[in-house]
């Protein structure tokens, strides 16, 4: 589910997506990016 990390990972304002990426990888995704301060898994 691409939204696995939306509520679990906060997105910083300026491109610090590491937390989002790590969360997404933990759920088996390739990584993640932030859109509108929400983490989206790719």
Curated annotation (Swiss-Prot):
Location in the cell: Secreted
Thylakoid is among the record's keywords: no
Principal location listed in the UniProt entry: secreted
Keyword Transcription regulation assigned: no
This protein's UniProt keywords: Disulfide bond, Ion channel impairing toxin, Knottin, Neurotoxin, Potassium channel impairing toxin, Secreted, Toxin, Voltage-gated potassium channel impairing toxin
Paired cysteines (S-S): 5-23, 11-34, 20-39, 24-41
GO molecular function, one term: toxin activity
UniProt tissue specificity: Expressed by the venom gland.
Origin: domain of life: Eukaryota
Domain notes: The presence of a 'disulfide through disulfide knot' structurally defines this protein as a knottin. Has the CSalpha/beta fold, which comprises one or two short alpha helices connected to anti-parallel beta-sheets stabilized by three or four disulfide bonds.
Function: Blocks Kv11/ERG potassium channels.
Entry's family note: Belongs to the ergtoxin family. Gamma-KTx 1 subfamily.
Protein name in the entry: Potassium channel toxin gamma-KTx 1.3
Species of provenance: Centruroides gracilis (Slenderbrown scorpion)
């Amino acid at each position: 589910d691409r939204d696995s990390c939306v509520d679990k990972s906060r997105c910083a304002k300026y491109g610090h997506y590491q937390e989002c990426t790590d969360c997404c990888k933990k759920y088996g995704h390739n990584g993640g990016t932030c859109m509108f301060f929400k983490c989206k898994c790719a």
